Swiss-Prot record:
The modification N6-(pyridoxal phosphate)lysine is found at residue 711. It comes from Psychrobacter cryohalolentis (strain ATCC BAA-1226 / DSM 17306 / VKM B-2378 / K5). This is Glycine dehydrogenase (decarboxylating). Belongs to the GcvP family. It catalyses: N(6)-[(R)-lipoyl]-L-lysyl-[glycine-cleavage complex H protein] + glycine + H(+) = N(6)-[(R)-S(8)-aminomethyldihydrolipoyl]-L-lysyl-[glycine-cleavage complex H protein] + CO2. GO terms for molecular function: glycine binding; glycine dehydrogenase (decarboxylating) activity; pyridoxal phosphate binding.
């Protein structure tokens, strides 16, 4: 006798249902999928797929992956790997320190989908919370560096240093091709600088910082505090080098700047560094938000994003991303940087650390760190041991002890490891001990006993040993936001008030084309705060991180199975970084064959702007290839240009499915053509959500591909970062993947330098993708791809009678996204794609991608995670908006093209309850245009933002409180 008429419940296997997560991730079950198929004219999924995905690219075999695991089983398996990680107390330093993230910030920001599932704040009206948090971050950076402006974060300290070098060349009036680097910089920073400089033809000169005075350099970069922990006043050196038209950047420890004289006071043009010490776990290297501060005159040359203060249509203060046309991916062929993302979630965490602790709190923490280091140095000095010598008198947190012999240094180092402490070796005889905000009395006892054989207690008085000339005298963090939220209740409510201003995926679908805003499941997110993954230093001894490396190796094997490639590099910490690493491998490969002149890169005109920007960074000549009327690469033009540049052809950069959202029939032919002429095929993985289980990029001819783990493999977008962009490559390119000075990659050549600061990039978020793949299994991953394709085609079919669908494949099908053309409606009514985007906010939705890859269009990518009900709400909103536009054109009910719900959108609660309603439509039409909105209303916190005003009156620091009243 069975307990159910459902056969699946007649066996224990069915009762356990290991594949249950698959149906939690997918927005529609089998019955709903049947409804979707029926709506577009199909009776089964197989027929639909056969007419959507070209037969020549199809993968007619199962992925070499295990079947799905349950959430519990996947977490248990990951736990076994985490248990194989030893978390010693880290006193390594070298740019990474243990921290204490305030619990109120961890729970209410890092672990809150209202913060981590949002997209980059291009739609400012529904992103005021994140924008305010980022403005706080910028204010922290401005205050501590003393410079006039700061960006909203870069990827990490080392890449920020490389960006400073590129910016120096843009801004400097020097004709020199040499860039000076202080020999006191961290090795990983120099590694990334060398990588970036090579293909621009810049010579990196490394030496004692005083030597910068005598050379002719377009830029100079100094470290403050140095790799040995020493603090040097750079004022005289900076003044001297600036006389030679040298642009000066200073890499600064953010926590040290709480006490030390600011870079601006010493004359720096740029200050940069990591904000990891402001409450962000080390995470085996990342993710962390780098800061980048600069002078006002350099604002149009600075990399990355800048948050600025503007006004909305009602005259109220509103925030936005400022000067967007200077972003590198928009500048395309004119760029010398491809930066198009940042670390928003991490920047918000760091900014909130300053908000919660306030000026007094951060000064107490910084002073405690320094006092620990001073007390430790005093113990060593007072021991009167001739073998031990403290190298520097002026330091912030790191004390370097010369042990006099390699034997003694090795003995102390090993003894420290034996009792659970990691120190750092500098050469044969020197040990560095870097104190942090987690240092305590027990640590002090242990560390002193390691060096002088007797445990010492902390002295009663906390001594500051820095000379007064090194200390700052100006006030920091004086804005009210840093002085108002120091109790947990106040902080909790402040965070909630910001969260409520933002529309994230915990509210509704975000259908941004080419962005893949899919479910970020809670079970995928849980492991990132496990101490084993969060609290490990990237340069910890390898025998302590066996489980971490095992997890990363396992993820690499998963990605190899999915893509068909022979090897994977996990170092790139963004999609753009992955592009860079991919082209870098291609250039190095050609050089290994003696073909140094293969410097032409073919790029379809529809490509994302990072593609030509990346090619320019690699010293390549960009040749644009036409696309045909169906959105495909023009094969005739590609053939002609391949033949024209045959002897110099280095690479083709291509996105598949195309940026136009179509599976190109001729992708194999395209790859064969490039190979025939000696080039390599770089595939952009932005649209990989249409590939997984359906095809393999290596199989169709790609040589290298970057994978956006923050798109296809479920790392959340974080409101604009973090991301990960690992690259898969064929065997002939594998030796040329990025390496690392301090942690070499086993199969990369020694002379291949790094593309990011840490060996594995943003390692602590890799468990998210590992969990996703493990829980979906080979069959679930294919189901996800099928449903992503089905959802996009359902949306296209439902909207095609209202908005033209711009591109389709041979059988009238799109891939995983579709482009609807707004230009005919705009020509007829004057209503633009921007008006539609703003009006969608009133309907509770974030706009699809605007005007990319075609101006005057919207690109929609619903992903597999959205239900039919949510798709139908979105479709009904777009249909209703079309009807509103036509009503305005017809002049019904006194609506006009100049005064209607679209051009006045979005409507805030303040507008709707205003006693004087002057619009020709009702308040209900403004705020509740469809019935579903009544039960789930999202109110934009500001009306339409004035972009022109914001750029003309640029203000990128926190406004006074009166501006909000």
């Amino acid at each position: 006798m069975t307990i159910s008429q459902n056969p699946a419940l007649d066996t224990f296997e069915g009762l356990f249902n290991e594949a249950e997560f698959v149906y939690r991730h997918l927005g529609s079950n089998d019955a709903k999928q049947a409804d979707l198929l029926s709506a577009i004219g199909y009776s089964d999924m197989a027929t639909f797929i056969n007419e959507t995905v070209p037969e020549p690219v199809r993968l007619h075999k199962e992925l070499d992956l295990p079947v799905a695991m349950s959430e519990h089983a996947a977490l248990a398996k990951l736990r076994t790997m985490a248990d194989d990680i030893t978390v010693n107390k880290s006193y390594i330093g070298q740019g990474y320190s243990p921290v204490r993230m305030p619990a109120v910030i961890q729970r209410n920001v890092l672990e809150n989908p209202g913060w981590y599932t949002a997209y980059t704040p291009y739609q400012a009206e529904i992103a005021q919370g994140r924008l305010e948090a980022l403005l706080n971050f910028q204010q922290v950076c401005i205050d501590l560096t003393g410079l006039e402006l700061a960006g909203a974060s870069l990827l990490d300290e080392a890449t920020a240093a490389a960006e400073a070098m590129a910016m120096s060349k843009r801004v400097s009036k020097s004709k020199s091709m040499q860039f000076f680097v202080d020999d006191r910089v961290y090795p990983q920073t120099l590694d990334v600088i060398n990588t970036r400089a090579k293909y621009f033809g810049w010579e990196v000169v490394v030496g004692d910082f005083e030597l910068a005075k005598s050379g002719d350099y377009f830029g100079a970069l100094f470290q403050y505090v140095g790799v040995e922990g020493d603090v040097k006043d750079l004022t005289d050196v900076i003044a001297a080098v600036k006389k030679n038209k040298t642009y000066v950047s200073v890499v600064s420890d953010i926590m040290s700047l709480v006490l030390l004289k600011s870079p601006a006071d010493m004359g720096a043009d740029v200050a940069l560094g990591s904000t990891q010490r402001f409450g962000i776990p080390m995470g085996f290297g990342g993710p962390h938000a780098a800061y980048f501060a600069f002078s006002d005159k350099a604002k149009r040359s600075a990399p990355g994003r800048i948050i600025g203060v503007s006004k909305d249509s009602q005259g109220n203060t509103a925030l936005r991303m400022a000067l967007q046309t200077r972003e590198q991916h928009i500048r395309r062929e004119k760029a010398n940087s491809n930066i198009c993302t940042s670390q928003v979630l991490l920047a918000n965490l760091a900014g909130m650390y300053a908000v919660y602790h306030g000026p007094g709190g951060v000064k107490r923490i910084a002073t405690r760190i320094h006092a620990f280091a001073t007390a430790f140095a005093d113990v060593i000095k007072n021991a009167n041991d001739s073998n031990l010598n403290v190298l520097h008198d002026q330091f912030f947190d790191s004390v370097v002890v010369d042990c006099g012999s390699e034997k003694l240094a090795s003995q102390i180092f090993q003894n420290a490891d034996n009792v659970g402490y990691n120190l750092w070796r500098l050469g044969e005889t020197k040990l560095s001990v870097a104190f942090s905000e987690t240092s305590d009395q027990k640590d002090f006892n242990v560390l002193t006993q390691l060096f002088v054989t007797k445990a010492h207690d902390l002295p009663e008085d906390a001594r500051v040993s820095l000379d007064s000339a090194h200390l700052r005298t100006d006030a920091i963090l004086s804005h009210p936001v840093f002085n108002s939220h120091h109790t947990e209740h106040e902080m909790l409510r402040y965070l909630k008030s910001l969260e409520d201003k933002d529309l994230a995926m915990n509210r509704s679908m975000i259908s941004l084309g080419s962005c893949t805003m899919k479910l970020n499941a809670t079970s995928e997110m849980l492991p990132i705060t496990w101490p084993e993954f969060a609290n490990v230093h990237p340069f910890a001894p390898r025998d302590q991180v066996t489980g971490y490396v095992a997890m990363i190796d396992s993820l690499q094997e998963q990605l190899k199975a999915i893509t068909g490639f022979d090897d994977v590099s996990m170092q790139p910490n963004s999609g753009a970084s992955g592009e860079y690493a991919g082209l870098l491998a291609i250039r190095r490969y050609h050089e290994s064959l003696g073909e140094t002149d293969r410097d032409v890169c073919l790029i379809p005109m529809s490509a994302h702007g990072t593609n030509p920007a990346t090619a320019m960074m690699m010293g390549m000549k960009v040749v644009v290839v036409k696309t045909d009327d169906n959105g495909n690469v023009d094969i005739d033009d590609l053939t002609a240009k391949s033949e024209e540049h045959s002897t110099r052809l280095g690479a083709l950069m291509i996105t598949y499915p195309s940026t136009h959202g179509v599976f190109e029939e001729g992708i194999r032919k395209i790859c064969d053509l490039i190979h025939k002429h000696g080039g390599q095929v770089y595939m952009d993985g932005a649209n990989m959500n249409a590939q997984v289980g359906m095809m393999q990029p290596a199989d169709v001819g790609a040589d290298v591909l970057h994978m956006n783990l923050h798109k296809t493999f479920c790392i959340p977008h974080g409101g604009g970062g973090p991301g990960m962009g690992p690259i898969g490559m064929k065997a002939h390119l594998a030796p040329f993947m990025a390496n690392h000075t301090l942690s070499p990659v086993h199969n990369a050549q020694k002379d291949c330098s790094a593309v990011s600061a840490a060996p594995y990039g943003s390692a602590s978020i890799l468990p998210i993708s590992w969990m996703y793949i493990a829980m979906m299994g080979r069959d679930g991953l294919l189901k996800a791809t099928e449903l992503a394709l089905l959802n996009a085609n359902y949306v296209a079919a439902e909207l095609k009678d209202h908005y033209p669908v711009l591109y389709t494949g041979k059988n009238g099908r799109v891939a995983h996204e579709c482009i609807i053309d707004i230009r005919p409606l705009k020509e007829e009514t004057g209503i633009s794609e921007s008006d539609i985007a703003k009006r969608l906010m009133d309907y509770g939705f974030h706009s699809p991608t605007m005007s990319f890859p075609v101006a005057g269009t919207l690109m929609i990518e619903p992903t597999e995670s959205e239900s039919k009900e949510e798709l139908d709400r979105f479709i009904s909103a777009l249909k209703s908006i079309k009807a509103e536009a036509l009503k305005a054109k017809a002049g019904e009910d006194n609506w006009t093209l100049e005064n209607n719900p679209l051009v006045n959108a979005p409507h805030t609660a303040a507008m709707v309850i205003d006693g004087e309603w002057t619009y020709p439509y009702s308040r209900e039409t403004a705020a509740f245009p469809l019935p579903y909105i009544r039960t789930n209303k999202f109110w934009p916190s500001v009306a339409r933002v004035d972009d022109a005003y914001g750029d003309k009156n640029l203000m990128c620091s926190c406004p006074s409180i009166e501006n909000y009243m």
